[in-house]
Amino acid sequence: EILALEKEHKETLRRIAEYKKILGSREEMNRVIKDDLAAIKEEFSVPRRTLIEDGPEAVYDESAVQVQEVVFVLDRFGYCKLLDKSTYERNQETVDTEQVHVIRCLNTDKICLFAASGSLYQIKAMDVPAGKLRDKGVPIENLSKYDGTKDSIVYLTCAQDLKGATLVFATKMAMVKQVPAEEFETNNRMVAATKLQDGDQVVSILPVEGQEEVVLQTTSGVFLRFPLEEISVLKKASRGVRGIKLAKNEELEKLYLIGDNPVIDYKGKEVHMNRLKLAKRDGKGSKVRL
């Protein structure tokens, strides 16, 4: 047993001397590494099983998307889906009654969502799941950066319908402006659609469709009618011009573009827009007799 221990001790001393030699010399260390790699190669090397060669140019075969007319619908709970054209036309009255937003578009189009925060959110129609009439759909938050708990939808349309159009913006602080739709052409999923003061938000966005006059309505029931041309055409990055002088604690509630049938319901009473006094922008307006 003593001889075995002496033998083991000598072997340990030899290894210590060998390791010191390796650690003390870069050349010796490289030699050991090369010897170890050569031993591994000799034991485990096998002929290459694959062939490396120049291949033909890669070609991606993407089948063309079949363009179809669809209908984007969004309910009051924020769930959206796509209906095919025939399903919508068979059930148009039901769909128009049950859904908050109904937009006809192509499946290759984009849905444009303008929010009270002044942001524009875009969703590819192809990303919206197709569904049947009674299918629930998916939350619109799942398809965009829009957050319905912190924001609200003011205007919803499709990119195709925006081309060549002009939108009129109005905020609760009575800032108004006209903006050419090309200002909103972008591939980004979210952009700023307008500039807002602190505490302000968008209350109305409407497309100009031949109307020549505008009516502003405040939270206290004051109305101001004036020519649309008095609202400046500005960039999306501008705040706009003041549309009406507001009283203390008063806010702008809504903007109307006067069309062929300028009658609205206000507190259960009909208000004929064309009977309002035609004034100038940035006036005080007047209350309507009910």
Please report, for each region that a protein language model flagged, where it lies by residue.
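C-terminal interaction appendages of subunits in large macromolecular complexes
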Residues: 1-290
